[in-house]
């Protein structure tokens, strides 16, 4: 079996519950209905762990296109680290080994610093507790936690509970809380260096309100009307001296996995002296970031580096000499190029791209058609040349108009997509292309909340997989987004590379 293949991604076109909220079901779509009656169709899971996100988290366009093009589940940082902690593979991480071995062999302090909360945006309490477990396994007694309090992604007075939980855990692993400060100071991202200095002085010089009981110190802060985000520096003292400060040659692990609010503190500790602000880098620090914080940082270690997604569908087709076209309007152009190609900006050899400008309107309910018809016209022209072995197109309307929450506009968007599908698929059939129609996630399938108010978010619904083929015996199975690339290779008569762990859904 060796044909040409067209992949149509109808962005935000999920399979809804056929209730009032399901605009796709409630809007006349004669051509879409005909496709579903005529050709084999199944469902793809496009959210949560099926696309490398935390369980129950709705999919998005970036993650969706990454998985579609990669032909494998591409785990996001949080999930990747969660799996490493739960399956204990973190113990095999070479940078983890380096950090703990260095501290043990050189009798150095190891400092864990980061946001102590379960907000799940910047850090995970689970990761911190695991890091303290590893210190126990290595027999490191000089392990200290510097707690940045949240109150933005969590309740403003939830921090005391996290400190209690951490202290109870440290009773089993050893180690101590060394300091507490609000994220307002420790996690600034707007170059307010006077705030960062409050955190720096606490970490390096032990400057702050002295306390022997950290839970009591939190209670006192609340009593003064100061909540988690704004907690002033608190230093844990024993016999009148700080339990621990960061010293020359120590090990520091910054366990925030999101980079934006971890950069400034990392800069002043490791990258750049700021004498005018009274901050100097600490010599000889063994400094470990949970993920890459900034490509320009020198001399820091990264515990979980970005994966290179090799042998994506685009790269594989280029390597075997197949021609390909990636086409979309502005709003989704990065998705069918950069994300679809595994985070690569430049086109592969024999890859062509067409960008159609999105309409310049304030919100897309004002023009629900967007530039879909222009995309369709250019796409049909390209199909008629028979030049390309593989084409991927994104129709943006279901998602971008779905985000407005305006029901009538979403109806128009759905009608637009149905018309574009007709012209696109008929041209493909006339030129001997087989077609797969999918979505990257849901949106227009769930336009209302239960109380009837507009829902502007993505949905957790599965998405369609429709296989337009002349083969009357063809069947398709249910799957996940990672199964799309292997299915395209099946149409093209190519064996999928070992890096692709998805499977062809065409039987």
UniProtKB/Swiss-Prot annotation:
Give the pathway annotation: Carbohydrate degradation; glycolysis; pyruvate from D-glyceraldehyde 3-phosphate: step 3/5
The coenzyme or cofactor needed here is: Mn(2+)
Q: Which top-rank group of organisms is this from?
A: Bacteria
Assigned keywords, A-Z: Glycolysis, Isomerase, Manganese, Metal-binding
Q: What is its EC number?
A: 5.4.2.12
What this protein catalyses is: (2R)-2-phosphoglycerate = (2R)-3-phosphoglycerate
One GO cellular component from the entry?
cytosol
For this protein, what does the record note about how its cofactor is bound? Binds 2 manganese ions per subunit.
Q: What CDD domains does the entry give?
A: iPGM
User: Binding residues for Mn(2+) 1, per the UniProt record?
Assistant: 399, 403, 458
Residues reported to bind Mn(2+) 2: 11, 61, 440-441
Gene3D superfamilies reported for this sequence: Alkaline Phosphatase, subunit A, BPG-independent phosphoglycerate mutase, domain B
**What residues bind substrate, as annotated?**
122, 152-153, 183, 189, 258-261, 332
Q: Which InterPro entries match?
A: Alkaline_phosphatase_core_sf, BPG-indep_PGM_N, Metalloenzyme, PGAM_B_sf, Pgm_bpd_ind
Where is the catalytic site? 61 (phosphoserine intermediate)
Q: Which Pfam families match?
A: iPGM_N, Metalloenzyme
Q: Which EC class, in a word? A: isomerase
- GO BP annotation list: glucose catabolic process; glycolytic process
Which SUPFAM superfamilies does UniProt cross-reference here?
A: 2,3-Bisphosphoglycerate-independent phosphoglycerate mutase, substrate-binding domain, Alkaline phosphatase-like
Instruction: Give any GO molecular function from the UniProt entry.
Output: phosphoglycerate mutase activity
What does the annotation say about its assembly with partners? Answer: Monomer.
UniProt function note: Catalyzes the interconversion of 2-phosphoglycerate and 3-phosphoglycerate.
Describe the family membership recorded for this protein in Swiss-Prot or TrEMBL.
Belongs to the BPG-independent phosphoglycerate mutase family.
UniProt-listed HAMAP family: GpmI
Query: What is the protein's given name?
Result: 2,3-bisphosphoglycerate-independent phosphoglycerate mutase
Gene symbol of the encoding locus: gpmI
